Amino acid sequence: MKGVAWILSVGNELLIGRVVNTNAAWLASKLTFLGYSVRRIVVVPDEENDIVEAFREAINRADVVILTGGLGPTPDDITNLAFCKALGVEAVVNDEALKMVRGKYESRGYALTPERIKMAMMPPGATPLPNPVGTAPGILYESGGKLVVLLPGVPKEMEAIFENHVEPLLKSRGPPVYFSEREVVVRGVPEADIAPVIREVMRLDKRVYVKSHPRGFEVNAPLLHIHIYASAGSKEEAEALVSKASDRLIELIKLKYGDRASISTG
């Protein structure tokens, strides 16, 4: 399987700022460490047309699509149905998924209402993913070399399903890419002055990426956390790239700014 991934997040609450999109950040980190290149994080409202459009574009441009949100029983939970529309197929009740949903509710004395049955609807041929924390199953769908995964929006549910079922699959099929990172903390040098140094370090190898994150005041008390990461075909090679970039970064900062710069690594 190729390594381009998109993350889709569904929910009005994300777009109005009521909820911070921690799911996307968590998934992006997971996918990156698995060797996938996350090229887009897209947030859409609980509107069918928007979800359909996002799905179609993602499936067309990515190898792996991970979506969170909109799998529950409420009227605005329509992600699974919109996914079917994006594929041009009729949503069907998956027998295995229905057993999962029924078991969750009937064990607590709740009836299996149409709203709850909706959580078991998915495209023909899709695989339901057990939810050990909540009630809505995840959905895994493969076609034409593409892998699409739909997960609940509740973080604990999303994380549990991903780690139990999705991560092992992606790890087994993912590109042979390893990831390494390091942080260098620099005090006393403004970000604008560090920028040329970072550009020079990044010229060492196209697999190395360096990004500065200011934490202090640019003029009065500059404080930078500089994140260095690299990907390579082996763990040792990735670590060597990061080590070389880190050493060169520190060397250049000391050369240019001397005692003015206070440097530490983490």
UniProtKB/Swiss-Prot annotation:
Superkingdom of the source species: Archaea
SMART domains according to UniProt: MoCF_biosynth
Pfam families documented for this protein: MoCF_biosynth (PF00994)
Family of this protein: Belongs to the CinA family.
HAMAP family: CinA_A
Classification via PANTHER family: NICOTINAMIDE-NUCLEOTIDE AMIDOHYDROLASE PNCC, NMN AMIDOHYDROLASE-LIKE PROTEIN YFAY
Name under which the protein is recorded: Protein PAE0875
Organism placement in taxonomy: Archaea, Thermoproteota, Thermoprotei, Thermoproteales, Thermoproteaceae
